[in-house]
Every structure is written in structure tokens, then in C-alpha cells.
Amino acid sequence: STLMRSSAASDVYKRQFQSQESLNVYSYATDDYFAFLEDNSGSNFSRDKMCLGVGRFPIRTVTEATQMVDKTISYMENKDSGSWKNNVTFVADDGNNEDSFTTNHMKQADQLAEAIEEMQPGFLVNKVYFDAYKRSSLGTYPDVHNEIEKLLKSGQLLINYTGHGSTTHWADESVWTQTDINNSSYKHLPVWVTATCDFTRFDDLNTSAGEDVFLNKSSGGIALFT
């Protein structure tokens, strides 16, 4: 496996792959490129296969690097094999006013949740789907926020979010925000899987919410697939 060390936005040597397209809606940055090691691979991202795993520590300073290495070692050496390692949570958006994805994200999340329940019945699957909660007069879902907070504090092996997002929050209702992440305090660190936009945009000039999940030295999460 390969580990990229830096936030691409602050990397003088630009150790990242940028797509050829310059238009914002078509352009993207990815580290997958560095794992296409076979001859003539790397020109077709939808077809070519990575030859090894690639991860990135989105660090900007020596202090952050030290903290993240310590955090990783602490997680790997954690002997607490309590029930938290059997807990997984799926959070699903209900779309927004500008699209027709009223149930799409929930269906996608539920397919994954049901697959785990079928193939790994030992896991306790928690489902936090927006439509199952009451919307406030301000158009937000305070109970969704509270449930996410409660589940994270109780300990989760994995938390999965499917829906709209940005560099600072989940969903247009802002059910989980960068402020929540930075203020979080819980012992057991989950793996975060986020099927959303921009949440861990490591080449942004500002630190994204997903990066802060990892950079939180004592809470947040231990890794992200995003």
C-alpha cells in the first residue's frame, strides 16, 4: 500500500493527479492514479484497476503528522473489543428541493444495510433515514442530528452517509457539520464512508469537514472512504 502525506492544497510539489478537463463540473483530483502500475494503464479510470491501496494523510504541519501517526498507532493497538465493533450506522438523505431524489439515497443506503444484515448477521445495523424523522419548522432535522451524535458516542465500527453534501456539512439541512466534527468527543473511532459531494475535498484551499474527521486528534474517525 502507499500513503500520501500532505493536503494537496498546500503541497508545493503537487503530489496529486488532476484530470485533463479544466471545467469545474468535469474536473477532479484523485490519488488512484498512483496505483495504476500495469503497462498502459491509467488512461481509463472506469476500466483500469488499482494494483495497491492508496491513502492520504491530509496534513499541513509536522505537529499534525505526529498527531495522526500517534492516532493511527493508538487505534491499531486498541485492545477494547467491546460491542462497539459490531455497530454500523447508515445515514440517508431525502434529497433536496431542486431534485427528485426523495427516496433514492435511502434506497441506496438500505441496499448496503440489508447486504450487511444478510452476509454478516453479527453486526447491529442502525438506520438513520431522514424521512423517518420529523422536520422542524425551520426545515431541519434536529432529531437526525441528535441520533447521529448519540450513535457516535455509543461507539460505531463504521458510519456510512449517502446523500447531498459539501465541504462543510451533510445535506442541505446540515444534519452533521464541520463544527460538530471539530467539537466531537467520543472514545471509539469509526471508519467513515461518505457517498456525497466535496465532503473530503483534500485539494481545497480550506480544510474540508472530511479532513477534520481524520485530523481530530482524539475523536472524529480513523479513516475515510469518500
Model-derived regions, located:
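Cysteine-dependent hydrolase recognition
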Residues: 1, 6-226
